[in-house]
Amino acid sequence: MLRGRLCTVRHMLNTDVNAYIALTNDLPSRGDYYSSQFTSPELLRKEFIQTAFVSEDKELFVIEDAAHNLIGSIHHFKSRTPLCREIGYRLFDPALAGRGYITAATGLLIDYLFGAYQYHRLELMMEPNNVGSERVALKCGFTFEGTLRQAFFLNGAIRDARLYSLLRPEWAAARAVVTNLPEL
């Protein structure tokens, strides 16, 4: 369990499965920047029973607020090289956007991935108009690397993707600055 001031990031529990399935398969809440594809409830239950959404290739966490409500999910998965992971996230209620939950959850996951594993590079990919995700990337220390032209299919259209990365030395340097600040 990864606890922060604003939210907690944790593995899914048996008691979360039905709520998670309902929330994750609610298409209207997905907005313009999350895939409109969804998975059958029975396949999701089967995957949870078999793996709890944790494998060498991917790991899914739920995000809960201070009142222990499931408000989103965040995951990491294999990217192009063994030293690289990509991070994805989603709020279940668009009304919660802009309150810092995803930035906080992403920060917790970054610390976990660099602290517990030998990954050297983390990536975020987003649709170019997704200003909220771009803010998350920048607040978490990611660097814009470029645009992948016509890189993915999203909600009926081929779209570009903006690629951001965070390297382990950049993360370590930022942590050193924060931990060496004088107390007020």
Segments (PLM) and residue ranges:
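Juxtamembrane/interface motifs at transmembrane-helix termini
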Residues: 39-43, 51-53, 92-93, 180-181
